[in-house]
């Protein structure tokens, strides 16, 4: 498995979920154990090499969980789920942001992170940057330190990385 082969398993779906959107479908990659393991290994390697002081991985639902959970388990990190409203049972911090095709709200438990925690955010695809901004806000509001974003892929043409000054690392460019 290499990055080119991994990229070939991320399929473009035209006009989904709305007309004019080119959706990146990662399910063929998830359905290929070799590719999925390769992606997780590459992402974990970035974190271990560049951010040895990390204590927590945060990931947004739903596709971010596909990467954040196994990375947290394999790396020995705490995992913080970033969820949609009314999915977390206790008091939350919340942020609303714009996607390329909708408005979204994300939440974390208020006590999930604290000052002194060192965080890397893990997600699937960086597109327009809305989720990046939301996660950065949620982590900052918790007083933890967000070090970087580690992603399966980045759609460079959408300039989502312009919405943060933090490092963004992606396994593949889309």
Regions found by a protein language model. Give the residues of each.
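Structural motif
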Residues: 55-56, 118-120, 148
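Active-site-facing substrate-recognition patch
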Residues: 1-53
